UniProtKB/Swiss-Prot annotation:
Pathway: Amino-acid biosynthesis; L-histidine biosynthesis; L-histidine from 5-phospho-alpha-D-ribose 1-diphosphate: step 6/9. Its main location: cytoplasm. It catalyses: D-erythro-1-(imidazol-4-yl)glycerol 3-phosphate = 3-(imidazol-4-yl)-2-oxopropyl phosphate + H2O. The gene is hisB. It holds the Pfam family IGPD. GO terms for molecular function: imidazoleglycerol-phosphate dehydratase activity. GO terms for biological process: L-histidine biosynthetic process. It comes from the Bacteria. Belongs to the imidazoleglycerol-phosphate dehydratase family. This is Imidazoleglycerol-phosphate dehydratase. HAMAP family: HisB. The keyword Metal-binding does not apply. It is an enzyme of class 4 (lyase). Keywords: Amino-acid biosynthesis, Cytoplasm, Histidine biosynthesis, Lyase.
Length: 199
């Protein structure tokens, strides 16, 4: 069964297209008009082995907030749609990933119950402007938006880090690895991996 999705969403603030294939090879085509965000989403696709296409345009002349948030919303919706009924997946996964001095730990439960816990970023991280457009405060917000619309429980802990770029990128790479493992088919799992029979 193909685990793919294509979702478009347009508002007065942005237009977003996301296409993904959970069983891809990590091929990406990303254009959000926010260069650092493009870099992070490229890393997400590469290290999750999802094939990922993202095209987003928004009112970045005001702020990049709407474009970043709306892209995370559509990405979450596409992830959820591609998973289907979640039969046979591992469901739980975690990953710890370094980037030089930065270290991030991400735990995922593809539970159908959205939640996001985000802790440990160094003091002042939220005020840094990364790549000229992306403020550090957007990281938590986009992760919350993704988790809510993907309907996953997501725990992100930054264990170490100093460089603002590295702190964010370690989180994206750890998220990518955790998602990859969580959605992998487990040949020992019969049906839905829940005692309730539904996720």
């Amino acid at each position: 069964m193909s685990r793919t999705a294509r979702i478009e969403r347009s508002t007065s603030e942005s237009s977003v297209l996301v296409e993904l294939d959970l069983d891809g090879t990590g091929r990406t085509s990303i254009d959000t008009t926010v260069p650092f965000y493009d870099h992070m989403l490229t890393a997400l696709g590469k290290h999750s082995l999802m094939d990922l296409t993202v095209v987003a345009k928004g009112d970045t002349h005001i702020d990049v907030h709407h474009t970043v948030e709306d892209t995370a919303i559509v990405l979450g919706q596409a992830f959820r749609q591609a998973l289907g009924d979640k039969a046979g997946i591992r469901r739980f996964a975690d990953a710890t990933v370094p980037l030089d001095e930065a270290l991030a730990h991400v735990v995922v439960d593809v539970s159908g119950r959205p939640y996001c816990v985000h802790t440990g970023e160094p003091e002042g991280q939220e005020y840094h402007l990364i790549g000229g457009h992306f403020t550090g405060s957007l990281t938590r917000h986009l992760l919350e938006s993704f988790a809510f619309h993907a309907r996953i429980a997501l725990h992100v802990r930054v264990l170490a880090g100093r460089d603002p770029h590295h702190v964010v990128e370690a989180q994206f790479k750890a998220l990518a690895r955790a998602l990859r493992y969580a959605v992998e088919p487990d040949p020992r799992v019969q049906g839905i991996p829940s005692t309730k029979g539904a996720l």
